[in-house]
Regions:
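Core SAM-dependent methyltransferase catalytic element
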Residues: 179-215
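A short acidic, Gly/Pro-enriched loop at the edge of an enzyme's catalytic core
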Residues: 85-96
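Class I SAM-dependent methyltransferase SAM/SAH-binding core
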Residues: 27-86
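A short SAM/SAH-binding and catalytic strip from SAM-dependent methyltransferases
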Residues: 96-109
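Conserved alpha-helix/loop element of class I SAM-dependent methyltransferases that forms part
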Residues: 7-24
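A short glycine-rich, Lys/Arg-flanked "PGG" loop and its adjoining helix->strand segment in the class I
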Residues: 110-122
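Short alpha-helix
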Residues: 162-180
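Conserved class I S-adenosyl-L-methionine
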Residues: 125-152
């Protein structure tokens, strides 16, 4: 019998909070939220503020709102149909944008990053990429990566190459530069080596919109 792996959303949420901080009254955006796993895990760890769950799939958002109701955070969750390349939000209207796993599927990733920058308020932060969370158990991280490798191998060498290229730090840096980001950091190596101590981190593009960057 295949051993069940623990949920990684709580540990990823911890990493997002560590980078973005917790302040009262914040507006958060879970971009590419799907059924809301990460956004709702984060809501459970902050006492106030609003979570915008954004996804192009209305069905996924319906499931996210159902889950929000079941987890007691429905009053602070807002579902918005939208995609990264054209976010239906005003300029400088949110405090934090994060996205786990959807970045690899954006049609125009550089444009999506420009949109994230546009909607961030001065002082806002963004964390875009994928991973299991730095606090994810070692045994589970190794098993997750092993299963992931097997899944990609079954799709053929081209799929393996594309998968690795999408998660390469150089790819993240190139896209950030194409988007015109002035200051950013890429953390993690892509989470492809199960023996690496920071493999659970995965890979993330992190940046802040400072007041002096506006104008």
């Amino acid at each position: 019998m295949t051993r069940a792996l623990p949920d990684y959303y709580p540990t990823v949420a911890e990493d997002v909070i560590t980078f973005c901080g917790i302040q009262g009254g914040r507006v958060w955006v879970d971009l590419g939220a799907g059924p809301g796993g990460l956004g709702l895990a984060l809501l459970e760890n902050v006492s106030d503020g609003v979570m915008v769950l954004m996804d192009p799939s209305a069905d996924a958002l319906r499931r996210a709102l159902t889950a929000a109701h079941e987890r007691g955070v429905y009053s602070r969750a807002v579902a918005v149909i939208g995609k990264a390349e054209s976010m239906p939000l005003p300029d400088e209207s949110v405090d934090v944008v994060f996205s786990r796993g959807s970045f690899y599927f954006w049609q125009d990733r550089a444009q999506g990053l420009r949109e994230v920058w546009r909607v961030l308020r001065p002082g806002g932060r963004a964390m875009i990429g994928g991973g299991l969370g730095s606090g994810y158990p070692d045994w589970a991280r190794r098993e997750f990566i092993r299963r992931q490798r097997q899944s990609q191998a079954r799709k053929g060498p081209d799929a393996v190459r594309e998968f690795r290229e999408a998660r390469n730090p150089d790819t993240f840096c190139r896209l950030a530069n194409e988007a015109g980001l002035k200051a950013f950091e890429v953390i993690g190596e892509g989470g492809q080596d199960p023996d690496a101590q920071n493999a659970g981190v995965g890979i993330w593009l992190r940046f802040a919109k400072e007041a002096e960057d506006v104008g």
